[in-house]
A protein has these predicted regions:
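FAD-dinucleotide binding site
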Residues: 1-227
Length: 227
């Protein structure tokens, strides 16, 4: 494939490559790396002025921040192997002290263990989690489109599905937060029930998405974007 920069007729640059990968996020970079390892020539095109996609690190007012993805899970064997190959060091998550919960009305509460909500809300949370686990168990995480109801499930907004299971706003907000803000980094009306099922299926069950000993295990020295 030939790539041509036609913005200036006097400064045309042509590149001959076997494959063009669109997007320099994690998927694009891994794809390009594997193609190169297989002996192909590759060009990666990225519209932004940086690589890494949802992994993004910045220094703001002299302090280093990871704005995007940053965690290394205990069961992410492929990522850990890559970190070893690149000589990247990790450090454990801070585990001491209380957790902080901000309720829907803005009240700040410190807690350990379960969320500081009513028993009824806890029951509604469990109801939604059980329903999501049951659906996630029905799909192949490597090929979710093969589910017999894939098109139907992909046409249902996750927010709509949650609202149909419970009228407990606090319970919905908590489950919504884990999948939407915590995992997929976008509002729950912007993705489908099928995508939520895939997220849970990729971790085997919902509990693994929120287990701090599994999901939020380590971080990378220098930030995940440096990988």
């Amino acid at each position: 494939m030939t790539l041509s920069n036609a913005s200036s007729s006097e400064n045309t640059v042509e590149l001959e490559r076997d494959v063009v990968v669109i997007g320099a996020g994690i998927s694009g970079l891994v794809t390009a790396r594997r193609l190169v390892e297989a002996g192909h020539t590759v060009a990666v095109l990225e519209a932004r002025d940086r690589v890494g996609g949802r992994t993004w690190s910045q220094t703001i007012d002299g302090e280093f921040f990871e704005i995007g993805g940053q965690w290394v899970s205990s069961d992410q064997d492929a990522l850990k192997a890559l970190l070893r190959e690149l000589g990247k060091e990790t450090f454990p998550r801070y585990r001491d002290g209380n957790s902080i919960y901000i309720s829907g009305d803005g009240e700040r509460r410190e807690f350990r263990g379960d969320f500081p909500v009513s028993d009824t809300t806890q029951q509604q949370i469990q109801l939604m989690v059980d329903a999501l686990d049951e659906l996630a168990a029905q799909i192949d995480a490597s090929a979710p489109w093969n589910h017999p109801r894939a098109a139907e499930l992909d046409g249902i907004q996750f927010s709509t599905w949650l609202a149909g299971l419970s009228d407990d706003a606090e319970a919905i907000r908590i489950v919504d937060h884990y999948i939407a803000a915590g995992m997929l980094t976008k509002p729950s009306h912007c993705f489908s029930l099928l995508q939520a099922m895939l997220m849970v299926a990729s971790a085997e069950k919902f509990e693994h998405l929120i287990d701090e000993g599994i999901l939020l295990d380590e971080r990378v020295v220098g930030g995940m974007q440096s990988v």
